[in-house]
C-alpha cells in the first residue's frame, strides 16, 4: 500500500512523463509559426 503522502503526488507522477512531449510539441508549433510567417 502506498503511503498517504505519496498518494498526493501520484497524479504528478502520472503527468511527469508527458511534460517533455508537451514542451517539444510547443517548441515545434512555435518554430512552425515563425517559419510560416
Curated annotation (Swiss-Prot):
PSII binds multiple chlorophylls, carotenoids and specific lipids. It comes from Thermostichus vulcanus (Synechococcus vulcanus). PSII is composed of 1 copy each of membrane proteins PsbA, PsbB, PsbC, PsbD, PsbE, PsbF, PsbH, PsbI, PsbJ, PsbK, PsbL, PsbM, PsbT, PsbX, PsbY, PsbZ, Psb30/Ycf12, peripheral proteins PsbO, CyanoQ (PsbQ), PsbU, PsbV and a large number of cofactors. It forms dimeric complexes. This is Photosystem II reaction center protein K. One of its GO terms (biological process) is photosynthesis. The chain crosses the membrane at residues 16-30. GO terms for cellular component: photosystem II reaction center; plasma membrane-derived thylakoid membrane. The gene is psbK. Keywords: Membrane, Photosynthesis, Photosystem II, Reaction center, Thylakoid, Transmembrane, Transmembrane helix. Residues 1-15 are lumenal. The keyword Membrane applies. InterPro entries: PSII_PsbK, PSII_PsbK_sf. Belongs to the PsbK family. Residues 31-37 are cytoplasmic.
